[in-house]
Amino acid sequence: MTDQCVVSAPVRVRTRRLDVKETGALPAYRALAEHFGPDEVYLLESAAGPARDRRHQFVGFGALLSLSVTDRVVRVEGVPALRGLLLERAGALLEDGPQGLRLRTAGGLWPLLRAMRDMFDAEGSASGFRFGFLGFFGYDTARYIEDLPHLIENRPGLPDVRMVLHRGSVVTDLATGRCELLLHESPYWPGLAPETVTGLLADVEQAWPDPSADGFPASAVTDDSAPEVFANDVERCLKHIAVGDIYQVQIGHELSIRSTADPADVYQRLRGRNASPYMYLAGIDGHRLIGASPELFVRIEDGEVTMRPIAGTVPRSGADGGIAAGVRLRSDPKEIAEHTMLVDLCRNDIGRIARPNTLDVPDQLDVEGYSHVLHLVSTVVGRARVDTDAFDTIAALFPAGTMTGAPKIRAMEIIESVERSRRGLYAGALGLLDVGGYTNLALCIRTLFHHEGVYRTRASAGIVADSEPGAEWTETLAKMSATHWAVTGEELL
């Protein structure tokens, strides 16, 4: 908890709000990324889905402070005064190591994140995002919660966890169309004239050309698995299920696509092909994250914790737009059983931090459609206890049971023994954390990771007792079809 950290005077922050002309999220991103650099700009938008998930779009810019943790090694970058203050506050949690500062214990991650949050005296919010951080929680964040085996080789790349404070954002209310420029000001960092940003936005072309019009760049695709290899993996999992080791486990594989395609163009194509509630385009250390996730990991709003687990998937097909496939999905005993099991796991996870008698499942077994697949979706809610915060909630829920299986820890152990490459941010979470408690994190699926001319995308299938290997392989291809097409212009199925 924060009592392990030095409590120095917080950084006072004032937020200026100015109405600006609405430009569209991607054109604004392109203009701001050209000025500030793509590592310092992010785009989050809701392009489809239920109204409760389609509220705002954000384009943040100008990184002031970033905290990254990889294998317990801690890296803090940004404005020197902010960097020094965070290290002062968190010093008791850190020690010197061969690669620099590192966490004394894995569990020290959570008080470290609290130390960063509590540095600021700002107008935060429990009901929406005003001032806070863009947060990335990779799948291996689980290692800061549970003691898990480490059998798959690490590869250089994204950190396990990263939190970034930006100096401002362009926020559009999708219900009203109102667009605001938020600028955060403090004596701790140089000021930024609003005219700098409004001038950039004034020159934006809203009707950006379709990047598919001139065709797609040449690409070369490799897979870290194959149908027969994946079938053997499924059989291994079925043996674990047969002896009662697990009830369900999510296993997958990864495609690597070498291409010269521009990440912003890929995002534009993905958005056009597979508009989703949780879309993102962001940079970390020269990597680009491009996603069209259908699934909420967790939203914390005015003390209410919400998860919307997706479990149960069929390819979208047929002249009726998938209506018949949706009816079959909602009446398939295998899919219903798998979904119910994972909804129960969500209830269990939320119950760890919820007030008594507040758990509820207000929506069950809804069918939601996307470009290539149909999903079964439910909503699970609970009221957070007053002695918990956003980081307690994330630690209690992470990783999403829909990406591991049940029981969760044993499923993660089996995933580590079966899969061939580390998941990275895939199956983790990405989104916004306000200093006032509001949190909105998407589950990182239907995602591309771009670095040095290579795009990687990944998908998993849920293995249960009556799974058929060929069908599960096809499900993974259906889930990767939109991201694969956005880079290559070619269908997987």
From Swiss-Prot:
GO terms for molecular function: transaminase activity. It comes from the Bacteria. InterPro entries: ADC_synthase, Anth_synth_I-like, Anth_synth_I_N, Chorismate_C. Transmembrane segments: none annotated. Signal peptide: none annotated. One of its GO terms (biological process) is L-tryptophan biosynthetic process. Coiled coil: none annotated. Belongs to the anthranilate synthase component I family. This is 2-amino-4-deoxychorismate synthase. It comes from Streptomyces globisporus. The gene is sgcD.
